[in-house]
């Protein structure tokens, strides 16, 4: 019984996957804290105005985490002048200067989309002290 040789396309694909994996690992940030849904975080966003660049903080509750690796995103929600504002940040993006966890939240859901319907004190998340 003769064994079949691997097609050349499959080995090329494997090499391409390895190249992509190496490139992504070089681009990933290593100084990020552990971020959980329910945490209150402060994200430093790089903003370029003309020829100047500054870092603008954006603070809010993490209501969602998606994907993993290079494509990991977090959705941060805050209340600004009585209106809920959500921003989605790619964690490993060069536009994100830093992420700091201000306080840990104690929640029992993976996604906190129910906070969108809540108003005022009902949007508060209990604090967790053990992490």
Curated annotation (Swiss-Prot):
Protein name per its UniProtKB record: Large ribosomal subunit protein bL19
InterPro entries from the UniProt entry: Ribosomal_bL19, Ribosomal_bL19_CS, Ribosomal_bL19_sf, Translation_prot_SH3-like_sf
UniProt keyword list: Ribonucleoprotein, Ribosomal protein
Single GO biological process annotation from the record: translation
Stated family: Belongs to the bacterial ribosomal protein bL19 family.
Keyword Ribosomal protein: yes
Job description of the protein: This protein is located at the 30S-50S ribosomal subunit interface and may play a role in the structure and function of the aminoacyl-tRNA binding site.
One function term, GO molecular function aspect: structural constituent of ribosome
Superkingdom: Bacteria
The keyword Kinase is annotated on this UniProt entry: no
Gene Ontology cellular-component annotations: cytosolic large ribosomal subunit
Pfam families: Ribosomal_L19
